[in-house]
UniProtKB/Swiss-Prot annotation:
Residues 26-179 are annotated as: Disordered. It comes from Equine herpesvirus 1 (strain Ab4p). Residues 150-165 have a biased composition (Polar residues). Pfam families: DUF5434 (PF17502). It comes from the Viruses. Residues 167-179 have a biased composition (Basic residues). Residues 26-39 have a biased composition (Low complexity). This is Uncharacterized gene 59 protein. InterPro entries: DUF5434.
């Protein structure tokens, strides 16, 4: 069935018209769209304000910002953190402090991770052939045991279910512990 007619794919406008016919759907659409509009209008001033701050800070710290070797050493960053003043400066300093605190930890963690991985690999290589050997040797026996176990488990549960529950079912272990 061709809902929108004209034998073509429905555009957004067609869909909007279709929804407007159905008042309930239109109301839902309105309810769904209004919060997003308000959120976008709220976000816009913040977004427009942020680049201004960036441009000011870039003008203020123009020399160290564009110096390609400033990031390599700690001196350039210290010079940067001393210059800006006010709330922006405080924020920038806090961000730099966080970065400087985080820096020494990360390489150590990365190195430790690689060492742990390398130590785990040979162990895994040693384990795997043993496991494969076991499955090849006694795989059939193991499977038979598992099948028997499964059957017994299913039988016991079925037998339990056939008995009619008298009154309330027995509370679980956790509740008994509290009682």
């Amino acid at each position: 069935m061709d809902v929108f007619g004209r034998g073509r794919a429905a555009t957004a406008d067609d869909y909007r018209r279709f929804l407007e016919r159905n008042s309930r759907a239109a109301a839902k659409l309105a309810a769904a769209t209004t919060p997003t509009h308000t959120a976008s209008s709220r976000q816009q001033p913040e977004v427009s304000a942020r680049p201004r701050h960036r441009s000011l800070s870039s003008r203020r710290n123009s020399v160290p910002h564009y110096d390609p070797h400033a990031g390599a050493g700690g001196d350039g960053q210290l010079a940067l953190s001393e210059r800006p003043s006010g709330t922006l400066g405080a924020l920038a300093m806090a961000a730099q402090r966080r970065k400087s605190i985080g820096r020494p930890d990360t390489p150590v963690n990365a190195a430790m991770g690689s060492a742990l991985r390398s130590s785990q690999r040979p162990r895994g290589d040693v384990r795997n052939p043993r496991g494969e050997g076991q499955t090849q040797r006694g795989g059939s026996r193991g499977e038979a045991n598992h099948a028997q176990r499964r059957q017994s488990v299913t039988q016991s549960t079925a037998a339990r279910q056939t008995q009619p529950h008298q009154g309330r079912p027995r509370p679980r272990r956790n509740t008994l512990r509290h009682m």
